Amino acid sequence: MSKKEDPAHASAADDQARVFPKFLELTADESRALLARHNVGRIAFSMNDRIDIQPIHYVFDGDWLYGRTSHGSKFATLARHSWCAFEVDEARDLFDWDSVVVKGHMELLDPELGSPDAYTRGLELMRSLVSGTFTEGDPAPHRSILFRLRASELTGRAARPGP
C-alpha cells in the first residue's frame, strides 16, 4: 500500500477535503423547484422597528407565492409596508440542505378591490392545499385574507457534505 492510500499517512489537505462542506448557489430553476416542493415557510417583515418572522403555509405558482393570513398585527403591518422576505428550507443534515429566500411586495387579494383573476387563482391554489379554504368546513376560518407575494428577488443556497 502506498503512503497515499494508507489512512495513517493522509495529508492535512485530504482531511480538510473530507471534513469541510461545500456551499453552493442554487439556480433559479432549482430554487423554484424547492419552493414548489414545499407548502410551509416563513415570512419576514419589519414591524415597530423590529424584524418579525412568522410561519405560513403557501402554494408557489410561477413567480408568485400565494397564502392566507388573518387580521392582526402582521396583516396591519404588511398592508402599510408590503416589502417582505420569505424563506423555505429543506434540511437533510447539518451540512446537507437547500434554502431559498424570496423578496418582494406582498399584495392583498380582494376580488372587489383588485384583480378578480388573481383572487380566483389564489383561491384555487389554496384549495389545492386545503380543500375547505373559505368554505363552511375551513379548518382555519380566522385566516380570511388571501395574499400573494411576487418573487422579485430569488436567491437559493445549498450545503453539501465534503467529498
Please provide the spans of the model-predicted regions.
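Short beta-strand segments
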Residues: 38-70, 86
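Short connector loops at helix/strand junctions that flank enzyme active sites
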Residues: 38, 53, 60-62, 79-83, ...
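Short, basic/aromatic recognition patches
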Residues: 16-42
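Charged, gly/pro-rich active-site loop segments
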Residues: 2-22, 90-163
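Helix-adjacent hinge/juxtasegments
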Residues: 67-97
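Generic marker of residues within folded, mature protein domains
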Residues: 33, 48, 76, 94-96, ...
